[in-house]
Amino acid sequence: MNSFSGSLEKAKTLTENNAPMVDPFGRAITYLRVSVTDRCDFRCTYCMSEHMTFLPKKDLLTLEELDRLCSVFITRGVRKLRLTGGEPLVRKNIMSLVRNLGRHVQSGTLDELTLTTNGSQLAKFAAELADCGVRRINVSLDTLDAQKFRQITRWGDIDRVMEGFDAAQAAGIKVKLNAVALKDFNDAEMPELMRFAHGRGMDLTVIETMPMGEIEEDRTDRYLPLSQLRADLERNFTLVDSDYQTGGPARYVTVKETGGRLGFITPMTHNFCESCNRVRLTCTGTLYMCLGQDDAADLRTALRASDSDAYLSAAIDEALLRKPKGHDFIIDRTHNRPAVSRHMSVTGG
Protein backbone atom coordinates (compact mmCIF):
# COMPACT_ATOMS: atom_id res chain seq x y z
CA MET A 1 0.00 0.00 0.00
CA ASN A 2 1.31 3.42 -0.92
CA SER A 3 1.33 6.51 1.29
CA PHE A 4 1.37 10.08 0.05
CA SER A 5 4.92 11.31 -0.37
CA GLY A 6 4.40 14.98 -1.21
CA SER A 7 5.18 17.95 0.98
CA LEU A 8 2.57 19.82 2.99
CA GLU A 9 3.36 23.08 1.19
CA LYS A 10 2.82 21.38 -2.16
CA ALA A 11 -0.46 19.97 -0.89
CA LYS A 12 -1.72 23.41 0.08
CA THR A 13 -1.03 24.66 -3.43
CA LEU A 14 -2.78 21.70 -5.02
CA THR A 15 -6.07 22.06 -3.19
CA GLU A 16 -6.89 25.74 -3.38
CA ASN A 17 -9.37 25.28 -6.25
CA ASN A 18 -10.99 22.03 -4.98
CA ALA A 19 -10.79 20.70 -8.53
CA PRO A 20 -13.06 17.79 -9.52
CA MET A 21 -11.45 14.35 -9.40
CA VAL A 22 -10.69 12.79 -12.80
CA ASP A 23 -8.72 9.58 -13.35
CA PRO A 24 -6.05 9.03 -16.06
CA PHE A 25 -8.73 7.77 -18.48
CA GLY A 26 -10.92 10.86 -18.21
CA ARG A 27 -13.52 9.31 -15.89
CA ALA A 28 -14.90 11.75 -13.32
CA ILE A 29 -15.06 10.31 -9.80
CA THR A 30 -18.47 11.20 -8.41
CA TYR A 31 -19.36 8.12 -6.34
CA LEU A 32 -17.74 7.10 -3.04
CA ARG A 33 -18.45 3.80 -1.30
CA VAL A 34 -17.40 3.75 2.35
CA SER A 35 -17.04 0.58 4.39
CA VAL A 36 -17.65 1.76 7.95
CA THR A 37 -16.90 -1.67 9.46
CA ASP A 38 -15.73 -5.11 8.34
CA ARG A 39 -17.99 -6.75 10.92
CA CYS A 40 -21.32 -8.34 10.10
CA ASP A 41 -24.04 -10.20 11.99
CA PHE A 42 -24.36 -12.66 9.06
CA ARG A 43 -21.73 -15.03 7.64
CA CYS A 44 -22.88 -15.40 4.03
CA THR A 45 -21.09 -18.38 2.54
CA TYR A 46 -19.97 -16.59 -0.65
CA CYS A 47 -18.72 -13.54 1.27
CA MET A 48 -16.74 -14.66 4.31
CA SER A 49 -15.73 -17.68 6.33
CA GLU A 50 -17.83 -18.59 9.36
CA HIS A 51 -15.00 -17.93 11.79
CA MET A 52 -13.75 -14.63 10.43
CA THR A 53 -10.93 -12.73 12.10
CA PHE A 54 -12.03 -9.12 12.09
CA LEU A 55 -9.90 -6.00 12.28
CA PRO A 56 -8.95 -4.85 15.79
CA LYS A 57 -11.23 -1.97 16.75
CA LYS A 58 -8.19 0.19 17.47
CA ASP A 59 -7.28 0.07 13.75
CA LEU A 60 -10.56 1.65 12.66
CA LEU A 61 -10.95 5.31 11.86
CA THR A 62 -13.18 7.14 14.30
CA LEU A 63 -16.58 8.22 13.07
CA GLU A 64 -15.33 11.81 13.18
CA GLU A 65 -12.39 10.88 10.94
CA LEU A 66 -14.70 9.12 8.50
CA ASP A 67 -16.89 12.22 8.39
CA ARG A 68 -13.87 14.41 7.63
CA LEU A 69 -12.64 12.08 4.90
CA CYS A 70 -16.06 11.85 3.27
CA SER A 71 -16.46 15.62 3.43
CA VAL A 72 -13.19 16.13 1.55
CA PHE A 73 -14.38 13.78 -1.19
CA ILE A 74 -17.66 15.68 -1.39
CA THR A 75 -15.77 18.96 -1.70
CA ARG A 76 -13.84 17.39 -4.58
CA GLY A 77 -16.94 16.42 -6.55
CA VAL A 78 -18.48 13.27 -5.07
CA ARG A 79 -22.26 13.49 -5.54
CA LYS A 80 -23.30 10.04 -4.30
CA LEU A 81 -22.07 8.41 -1.10
CA ARG A 82 -22.92 4.86 -0.05
CA LEU A 83 -22.20 3.42 3.39
CA THR A 84 -21.39 -0.29 3.36
CA GLY A 85 -19.68 -2.93 5.45
CA GLY A 86 -19.67 -5.64 6.60
CA GLU A 87 -23.04 -4.59 7.90
CA PRO A 88 -22.91 -0.80 8.38
CA LEU A 89 -25.70 -0.66 10.94
CA VAL A 90 -23.85 -2.86 13.46
CA ARG A 91 -21.14 -0.24 14.01
CA LYS A 92 -21.58 1.45 17.37
CA ASN A 93 -23.06 4.98 17.14
CA ILE A 94 -23.23 4.74 13.33
CA MET A 95 -26.24 7.06 13.22
CA SER A 96 -24.09 9.96 14.39
CA LEU A 97 -22.05 9.60 11.19
CA VAL A 98 -25.18 9.26 9.05
CA ARG A 99 -26.65 12.39 10.63
CA ASN A 100 -23.45 14.36 10.10
CA LEU A 101 -23.19 13.30 6.46
CA GLY A 102 -26.84 14.21 5.98
CA ARG A 103 -25.89 17.87 6.28
CA HIS A 104 -24.33 17.65 2.82
CA VAL A 105 -27.63 16.43 1.36
CA GLN A 106 -29.44 19.24 3.11
CA SER A 107 -26.99 21.84 1.74
CA GLY A 108 -27.18 20.43 -1.79
CA THR A 109 -23.48 19.53 -2.05
CA LEU A 110 -24.38 15.81 -2.04
CA ASP A 111 -27.14 14.43 -4.25
CA GLU A 112 -27.60 11.16 -2.44
CA LEU A 113 -26.65 9.50 0.85
CA THR A 114 -27.51 5.82 0.86
CA LEU A 115 -26.41 2.48 2.24
CA THR A 116 -26.31 -1.23 1.52
CA THR A 117 -27.54 -3.44 4.35
CA ASN A 118 -28.54 -7.02 5.06
CA GLY A 119 -31.74 -5.69 6.61
CA SER A 120 -31.24 -7.20 10.06
CA GLN A 121 -31.11 -3.81 11.82
CA LEU A 122 -33.51 -1.89 9.58
CA ALA A 123 -36.54 -2.19 11.84
CA LYS A 124 -34.51 -0.40 14.53
CA PHE A 125 -32.98 2.34 12.38
CA ALA A 126 -35.28 2.97 9.39
CA ALA A 127 -37.12 5.99 10.79
CA GLU A 128 -33.88 7.65 11.90
CA LEU A 129 -32.22 6.96 8.55
CA ALA A 130 -35.08 8.73 6.79
CA ASP A 131 -34.81 11.64 9.21
CA CYS A 132 -31.10 11.96 8.32
CA GLY A 133 -31.84 12.34 4.61
CA VAL A 134 -31.50 8.74 3.42
CA ARG A 135 -34.07 8.29 0.66
CA ARG A 136 -32.96 5.00 -0.91
CA ILE A 137 -31.27 1.86 0.38
CA ASN A 138 -30.17 -1.49 -1.03
CA VAL A 139 -31.07 -4.62 0.91
CA SER A 140 -29.30 -7.91 0.20
CA LEU A 141 -31.62 -10.93 0.02
CA ASP A 142 -30.72 -14.07 -1.93
CA THR A 143 -33.72 -16.26 -1.15
CA LEU A 144 -37.25 -16.09 0.26
CA ASP A 145 -37.02 -19.59 1.71
CA ALA A 146 -36.37 -19.37 5.47
CA GLN A 147 -34.36 -22.58 5.61
CA LYS A 148 -32.20 -21.66 2.62
CA PHE A 149 -31.77 -18.15 4.02
CA ARG A 150 -30.38 -19.62 7.22
CA GLN A 151 -28.14 -21.90 5.17
CA ILE A 152 -26.65 -19.13 3.02
CA THR A 153 -26.29 -16.53 5.83
CA ARG A 154 -25.45 -19.08 8.54
CA TRP A 155 -26.68 -16.71 11.27
CA GLY A 156 -29.51 -14.77 9.64
CA ASP A 157 -33.22 -14.56 10.52
CA ILE A 158 -35.38 -13.83 7.47
CA ASP A 159 -38.29 -12.61 9.63
CA ARG A 160 -36.13 -9.75 10.92
CA VAL A 161 -35.25 -8.80 7.36
CA MET A 162 -38.93 -8.75 6.38
CA GLU A 163 -39.66 -6.51 9.37
CA GLY A 164 -36.89 -4.27 8.08
CA PHE A 165 -38.54 -4.02 4.66
CA ASP A 166 -41.79 -2.97 6.32
CA ALA A 167 -40.08 -0.38 8.52
CA ALA A 168 -38.08 1.15 5.66
CA GLN A 169 -41.08 1.48 3.37
CA ALA A 170 -43.21 2.85 6.21
CA ALA A 171 -40.53 5.52 6.74
CA GLY A 172 -40.74 6.50 3.07
CA ILE A 173 -37.40 4.99 2.07
CA LYS A 174 -37.25 3.48 -1.41
CA VAL A 175 -35.83 -0.04 -1.23
CA LYS A 176 -33.93 -1.93 -3.92
CA LEU A 177 -33.37 -5.64 -3.51
CA ASN A 178 -29.92 -7.11 -4.29
CA ALA A 179 -29.52 -10.84 -4.90
CA VAL A 180 -26.32 -12.72 -5.70
CA ALA A 181 -27.06 -15.31 -8.40
CA LEU A 182 -25.87 -18.72 -7.22
CA LYS A 183 -26.00 -21.78 -9.44
CA ASP A 184 -28.14 -24.63 -8.06
CA PHE A 185 -29.10 -22.52 -5.05
CA ASN A 186 -31.37 -19.66 -6.04
CA ASP A 187 -31.36 -19.61 -9.86
CA ALA A 188 -34.75 -21.33 -10.03
CA GLU A 189 -36.05 -18.88 -7.41
CA MET A 190 -35.35 -15.71 -9.39
CA PRO A 191 -38.87 -15.41 -10.85
CA GLU A 192 -40.29 -15.60 -7.31
CA LEU A 193 -37.78 -13.06 -5.99
CA MET A 194 -38.62 -10.76 -8.89
CA ARG A 195 -42.38 -11.00 -8.30
CA PHE A 196 -41.83 -10.39 -4.58
CA ALA A 197 -39.75 -7.27 -5.20
CA HIS A 198 -41.93 -5.83 -7.94
CA GLY A 199 -45.07 -6.59 -5.95
CA ARG A 200 -43.75 -4.32 -3.19
CA GLY A 201 -42.63 -1.59 -5.58
CA MET A 202 -38.96 -2.50 -5.31
CA ASP A 203 -36.38 -2.93 -8.07
CA LEU A 204 -34.42 -6.18 -8.08
CA THR A 205 -30.74 -6.29 -9.04
CA VAL A 206 -28.98 -9.62 -9.52
CA ILE A 207 -25.22 -9.84 -9.15
CA GLU A 208 -22.64 -12.32 -10.37
CA THR A 209 -20.57 -13.81 -7.57
CA MET A 210 -17.12 -12.21 -7.43
CA PRO A 211 -13.82 -14.03 -6.72
CA MET A 212 -12.83 -12.13 -3.57
CA GLY A 213 -11.41 -13.59 -0.36
CA GLU A 214 -10.83 -17.11 0.90
CA ILE A 215 -14.03 -18.95 1.85
CA GLU A 216 -14.78 -22.54 2.87
CA GLU A 217 -16.64 -23.54 -0.30
CA ASP A 218 -15.55 -23.61 -3.94
CA ARG A 219 -17.21 -20.55 -5.45
CA THR A 220 -16.64 -21.88 -8.98
CA ASP A 221 -19.37 -24.43 -8.25
CA ARG A 222 -21.83 -21.60 -7.56
CA TYR A 223 -20.84 -19.25 -10.38
CA LEU A 224 -23.78 -18.44 -12.67
CA PRO A 225 -23.29 -16.14 -15.69
CA LEU A 226 -26.12 -13.63 -15.76
CA SER A 227 -26.37 -14.04 -19.53
CA GLN A 228 -27.61 -17.55 -18.78
CA LEU A 229 -29.99 -16.31 -16.08
CA ARG A 230 -31.42 -13.69 -18.42
CA ALA A 231 -31.98 -16.30 -21.12
CA ASP A 232 -33.80 -18.48 -18.60
CA LEU A 233 -36.03 -15.58 -17.50
CA GLU A 234 -36.84 -14.64 -21.09
CA ARG A 235 -38.59 -17.97 -21.55
CA ASN A 236 -41.41 -16.66 -19.34
CA PHE A 237 -40.95 -12.89 -19.16
CA THR A 238 -40.56 -10.03 -21.63
CA LEU A 239 -37.42 -8.06 -20.73
CA VAL A 240 -37.19 -4.65 -22.38
CA ASP A 241 -33.83 -2.83 -22.21
CA SER A 242 -34.01 0.43 -20.26
CA ASP A 243 -31.76 3.48 -20.05
CA TYR A 244 -32.58 3.86 -16.34
CA GLN A 245 -29.47 4.47 -14.23
CA THR A 246 -28.70 4.89 -10.54
CA GLY A 247 -25.05 5.95 -10.83
CA GLY A 248 -23.83 2.40 -10.24
CA PRO A 249 -22.84 -0.44 -12.58
CA ALA A 250 -26.24 -2.12 -13.03
CA ARG A 251 -27.82 -2.37 -16.47
CA TYR A 252 -31.60 -2.38 -16.23
CA VAL A 253 -34.52 -3.91 -18.08
CA THR A 254 -38.23 -3.41 -17.56
CA VAL A 255 -40.21 -6.61 -17.02
CA LYS A 256 -43.38 -6.23 -19.05
CA GLU A 257 -45.40 -8.76 -17.05
CA THR A 258 -44.71 -7.15 -13.64
CA GLY A 259 -44.07 -3.54 -14.62
CA GLY A 260 -40.96 -3.54 -12.43
CA ARG A 261 -37.26 -3.04 -13.10
CA LEU A 262 -34.63 -5.77 -13.09
CA GLY A 263 -30.93 -4.91 -12.97
CA PHE A 264 -27.89 -6.99 -13.89
CA ILE A 265 -24.42 -6.43 -12.42
CA THR A 266 -21.96 -8.50 -14.44
CA PRO A 267 -18.33 -8.01 -13.36
CA MET A 268 -17.36 -11.39 -14.79
CA THR A 269 -19.18 -11.72 -18.13
CA HIS A 270 -19.55 -8.06 -19.12
CA ASN A 271 -17.50 -5.71 -17.01
CA PHE A 272 -18.59 -2.13 -16.40
CA CYS A 273 -15.11 -0.62 -16.16
CA GLU A 274 -15.40 1.81 -19.07
CA SER A 275 -17.90 3.93 -17.15
CA CYS A 276 -16.45 3.48 -13.65
CA ASN A 277 -17.08 6.62 -11.61
CA ARG A 278 -16.28 5.31 -8.12
CA VAL A 279 -13.65 4.56 -5.53
CA ARG A 280 -13.90 2.64 -2.26
CA LEU A 281 -12.77 3.71 1.19
CA THR A 282 -12.33 1.21 4.02
CA CYS A 283 -12.91 1.71 7.73
CA THR A 284 -9.13 1.90 8.24
CA GLY A 285 -8.66 4.74 5.76
CA THR A 286 -7.44 2.63 2.86
CA LEU A 287 -8.57 3.81 -0.57
CA TYR A 288 -9.10 1.20 -3.28
CA MET A 289 -9.23 2.71 -6.72
CA CYS A 290 -10.64 -0.55 -8.18
CA LEU A 291 -12.72 -3.29 -6.59
CA GLY A 292 -10.95 -5.95 -8.64
CA GLN A 293 -7.32 -5.01 -7.95
CA ASP A 294 -5.21 -4.96 -4.80
CA ASP A 295 -3.51 -1.59 -5.35
CA ALA A 296 -4.46 0.75 -2.52
CA ALA A 297 -3.55 4.08 -0.96
CA ASP A 298 -3.16 4.88 2.73
CA LEU A 299 -5.25 7.97 3.49
CA ARG A 300 -5.13 7.52 7.26
CA THR A 301 -1.56 8.81 7.46
CA ALA A 302 -2.43 11.90 5.44
CA LEU A 303 -5.60 12.40 7.47
CA ARG A 304 -3.71 12.43 10.74
CA ALA A 305 -0.68 14.36 9.48
CA SER A 306 -2.38 17.73 9.60
CA ASP A 307 -5.59 19.46 10.66
CA SER A 308 -5.62 20.99 7.19
CA ASP A 309 -7.38 19.02 4.46
CA ALA A 310 -4.73 20.08 1.93
CA TYR A 311 -2.43 17.14 2.61
CA LEU A 312 -5.35 14.71 2.48
CA SER A 313 -6.68 16.11 -0.77
CA ALA A 314 -3.26 15.83 -2.39
CA ALA A 315 -3.00 12.21 -1.24
CA ILE A 316 -6.32 11.51 -2.96
CA ASP A 317 -5.04 13.09 -6.18
CA GLU A 318 -1.89 10.98 -6.10
CA ALA A 319 -3.94 7.81 -5.56
CA LEU A 320 -6.29 8.54 -8.44
CA LEU A 321 -3.34 8.66 -10.82
CA ARG A 322 -3.12 4.89 -10.25
CA LYS A 323 -6.77 4.08 -10.95
CA PRO A 324 -6.61 1.29 -13.58
CA LYS A 325 -8.60 1.04 -16.78
CA GLY A 326 -10.25 -2.20 -15.64
CA HIS A 327 -10.33 -4.97 -13.05
CA ASP A 328 -8.64 -8.38 -12.99
CA PHE A 329 -11.61 -10.54 -12.02
CA ILE A 330 -11.51 -14.07 -13.39
CA ILE A 331 -12.87 -17.35 -12.07
CA ASP A 332 -9.66 -19.38 -11.63
CA ARG A 333 -10.79 -22.97 -12.07
CA THR A 334 -7.21 -24.25 -12.40
CA HIS A 335 -5.83 -23.09 -9.06
CA ASN A 336 -9.16 -22.62 -7.22
CA ARG A 337 -8.16 -19.28 -5.76
CA PRO A 338 -9.75 -15.84 -5.61
CA ALA A 339 -8.66 -13.12 -8.02
CA VAL A 340 -8.42 -10.73 -5.07
CA SER A 341 -7.31 -11.98 -1.65
CA ARG A 342 -9.23 -9.52 0.54
CA HIS A 343 -12.84 -10.18 1.49
CA MET A 344 -15.67 -8.03 0.18
CA SER A 345 -16.53 -7.18 3.80
CA VAL A 346 -13.17 -5.39 4.08
CA THR A 347 -13.50 -3.46 0.82
CA GLY A 348 -17.18 -2.71 1.15
CA GLY A 349 -19.92 -4.49 -0.74
UniProtKB/Swiss-Prot annotation:
The keyword Iron belongs to this UniProt entry's keyword annotation: yes
Residues engaged in binding S-adenosyl-L-methionine: 46, 86, 140, 210
Keywords: 4Fe-4S, GTP-binding, Iron, Iron-sulfur, Lyase, Metal-binding, Molybdenum cofactor biosynthesis, Nucleotide-binding, S-adenosyl-L-methionine
Pfam families, sorted: Fer4_12 (PF13353), Mob_synth_C (PF06463), Radical_SAM (PF04055)
Span of the signal peptide: none
Binding positions for [4Fe-4S] cluster 2 per the UniProt entry: 273, 276, 290
SUPFAM superfamilies linked to this entry: Radical SAM enzymes
Binding site for GTP: 33, 82, 116, 176, 278-280
PROSITE patterns according to UniProt: MOAA_NIFB_PQQE (PS01305), RADICAL_SAM (PS51918)
GO MF annotation terms: 4 iron, 4 sulfur cluster binding; cyclic pyranopterin monophosphate synthase activity; GTP 3',8'-cyclase activity; GTP binding; metal ion binding; S-adenosyl-L-methionine binding
The protein, known as: GTP 3',8-cyclase
Species for this entry: Agrobacterium fabrum (strain C58 / ATCC 33970) (Agrobacterium tumefaciens (strain C58))
Gene (UniProt): moaA
